[in-house]
C-alpha cells in the first residue's frame, strides 16, 4: 500500500495527516508551531514527527510517495519562500531543506492554494474547475484555482489577500510591517487584538473580561450567547 502525508503549517499549530493515495484521510495529528529562533526548528520537528509515525506504523519509507507542505506565505514554483511573517522565515527553500532533513519526496505550496486544490479534488469544489478559497487562522489566506490551475502570480503571492490594506488610519503595524492589513481585523489573532482594544476603551460590561487568555473562539461563543461587545466585534469583521 502507498501513502502520502499532508502538512498544514500554521502560525499556532501544525496539522499532519496520513492519507491513502486516493485521498482518504487515515489519521491526523496536531503539534505546536515552534517559532523560536525565527522558526528554524519547524521543518526538523515536522520531519522527526513524520518519521516516528512511519516507524510506529511499520510503513516502509519506499511506500511513502511524498509529503505535501502548505506554507502560510508566497511560494515560488521551486519551493522557495522569500518571506513568511507568521513563521519568522526569510529566504528559505523549504522544498530542498525538508527533503534533506526527512529523506522523503516533498512538494511545497502556499497553504490556501493547496487547500483550494484539495477542495477541488475531494471537497466542496469537487466537480468544478474554478475554485476560490479563503483560510482563516493565525493569519488570512486566499487561494484561487482557474481552469484547474492555481493562480500563483508572478511572485507566488496571487492569493495573499491577508495583506491587502483595508484601513488607512491604522497605527498598529501588521506582522508584515504595513498598516491596516485585512489580517489585522479578521484573523483569529486579529479579532482578539481588536477585542482587547475595545475592552480597554469601552466601559460596558462584557463576559469577555472574564477570560484570562482570550481567544477567537471565546469571542464567537459569547456572541452567540448575546454579549453585546462580542457581537459588535463579530459584526465588524
Spell out what each predicted region is:
Residues 183-237:
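A mobile "lid/hinge" subdomain adjacent to the ATP/sugar-phosphate binding pocket shared
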Residues 39-48, 55, 62-67, 73-132:
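Glycine-rich phosphate-binding loop and adjoining helix at the ATP-binding site
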Residues 2-8, 64-68, 131-135, 173-175:
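Short glycine-aspartate micro-motif
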Residues 3-48, 80-82, 156:
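Short glycine-rich, Thr/Ser-proximal phosphate-binding strand/loop in the N-terminal lobe
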Residues 108-112, 166-203:
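Glycine-rich phosphate-binding loop plus the immediately following alpha-helix
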Residues 12, 72-74, 137-139:
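Short glycine-rich anion-binding loops that position phosphate/pyrophosphate groups of nucleotides
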Residues 16, 31, 69, 98, ...:
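Residue-level signal for inorganic ion chemistry
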Residues 126-185:
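Glycine-rich phosphate-binding loop of actin/hexokinase-like ATP-binding domains
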